[in-house]
Amino acid sequence: MLKLTTTSVTFHVLRYFQLGLSVTNLLLASFAIITNYKVDRILRLSLAVSIISSVYFGIVRFLPVLLIFVMEIVQTVLWFTAFVTLASKFGSMSCSSMPRGINFDYSGSCKIAKIDILPEAVLFILFLATTYASYITVLSQAKENGSSTRSVLKACVKALRDTVDRLETSLEESEPLLDLEVQEDARTETESIEDSTDSEDNANIEQEKVIDGSIEHSS
């Protein structure tokens, strides 16, 4: 009984850590995107995974044990992907050399993204632990119901395939929206660059006029 209580408490502690880090990652990814003038798919991936995890924690108590195990596997894969992609892009990047402007701050976004790498790595490890715990729970319930381990694994694989298919369908539907956002942000950035270039040209023209006027007056 003591062992069961200790295991339950440990599992709930892991859940609280996962929830806290997911919310932290959600805030960091949001700030990184806000301070980044352009659309960054890697930062958006981190934000999307954080939202998925937050929703998952809200409904996990209503899910059956087998579906929880499948969702734990999916969460582990998602956090591993988010962690690896974020670390590969921002891990070795020098943030101090990146430009800053009135409407954008690449340097600040880079620094926030670097900080965000650690929570994502920890979340990946925590989900590995809860995935294993969920697997043990599924096996114990299967033994109580007289089911074999093989049948349980087959059911898990089928549920996992269905979940992956649904995620792929959702991602395919969201790609056109992301492409439109990328085009819009690229257009806005181009217009800002053109405006700044026109301002510089006008300033140079005014300066040349002043110089020409000074020369004529001297003559």
Curated annotation (Swiss-Prot):
Basic and acidic residues composition bias: residue spans: 206-219
Membrane topology: Multi-pass membrane protein
Ranges facing Cytoplasmic side: 1-15, 63, 138-219
Stretches assigned to the Vacuolar side: 37-41, 85-116
TM region(s), chain numbering: 16-36, 42-62, 64-84, 117-137
Localization annotation: Vacuole membrane
Composition-biased stretches (Acidic residues): 191-203
GO cellular component terms, A-Z: cytoplasm; fungal-type vacuole; fungal-type vacuole membrane
Region (Disordered): 176-219
Predominant subcellular localization, coarse grouping: membrane
UniProt entry keywords in alphabetical sequence: Membrane, Transmembrane, Transmembrane helix, Vacuole
Classification via PANTHER family: MARVEL DOMAIN (PTHR37451), MARVEL DOMAIN-CONTAINING PROTEIN (PTHR37451:SF1)
Note, other: Present with 339 molecules/cell in log phase SD medium.
Protein name per its UniProtKB record: Uncharacterized vacuolar membrane protein YNR061C
Source lineage: Eukaryota, Fungi, Dikarya, Ascomycota, Saccharomycotina
